[in-house]
């Protein structure tokens, strides 16, 4: 769907559907008053009948009003005089989108300048959230359905903005479009079945991205190279599978070669049975989403490429399939990581940290400004934070603050958990330098403590997206595309710093 931004009078636009807000108590803002005046009071007359209370997200569709070039006018409730919060604003936009999808019009014009959103400026902040909501709502995954979704009539939405804010709303639409593209790519990868989306498939996706963007350097390391690099922990995870592991490295140079890069490291476990420490069968199909960390790095890179951000970015994807077999890693095995530290593998279902630790060591060679790893790492994070916010831990307060701020502004929030030294003791092993699990307490924190031992050479943060990367069960089941908005916002901020 195309997003267009214009600065024209709402009452004069020719469109299939004009969307206008109405406050509670039938209050009309400046835009609605102008449209009402053009219709000789037709909107006021309808409102007096009490068909629309004006509560946020309520809608009323009017046809063929006099004095307008718009075929329809969709009134949407905007609530009381106070500004809407992000959640209410998203719900309002989604309500409008739901009505528009059911109409046969090919275009719509949204005249929503009169609605204020708390903690967001009237132009960029408000309209970026609107545009992302509209575009993300267009996502459909029906690749494996014999009956595809019907093509939607709606092809274009025009956002009306005042002249003073036109440039900022255009910027918001451009950024939102790039983020939505990245989220859709992330969701596609996550939703693919694991018999198709395995480590080699992700490697092919990286190569295709490299072909489409000539400035993108792509390297794919096979299992022999992974072993030769000394990545004993990473290699151990994939050795039980017929699908060989792959380390994928993508380098984007948007700034001077001498500028230190930002590094994103993604966990790419394309299917996680738990290995010899086998998971329960119920719900195991959702373990195809255990590669959503890697998928979100792919999606963020797509957004960065589309926006041509003036930064240097390295993306490292540690991809493997965790399967039980006669060759699989056993509980009690000890492996040597690329850093030289030894790990006693007490639970083969704590495999994400094993692929990530070697990838984090590999990241040192890029002398990064900051490294962020993204992983569906612990069920404990879902217990602690649910599905609304990602867990965030790290070794640098400034980096943590930047990510928290980016999450708030992108409406893709994270929440900081502690990384106190006392938790490190839970990882002590009598036989190796470190155990790969720390017992039942503070599972998200001890997993991050494990990773922190491999991230001492740089500023590092860890995003645990186990609760936010996908929706379980029901009609809405599927990958969410998070945390692409948070990560892209963080990089946008660094690009403009």
From Swiss-Prot:
Family classification: Belongs to the peptidase M17 family.
Cofactor(s) needed for function: Mn(2+)
Compartments in which it is found: Cytoplasm
NCBIfam families: PRK00913.1-2, PRK00913.1-4, PRK00913.2-4
HAMAP family per record: Cytosol_peptidase_M17
The keyword Zinc-finger appears for this protein: no
Protein name as annotated: Probable cytosol aminopeptidase
Biological source species: Pseudomonas putida (strain W619)
List of residues binding Mn(2+) 2: 267, 272, 290, 351
Function: Presumably involved in the processing and regular turnover of intracellular proteins. Catalyzes the removal of unsubstituted N-terminal amino acids from various peptides.
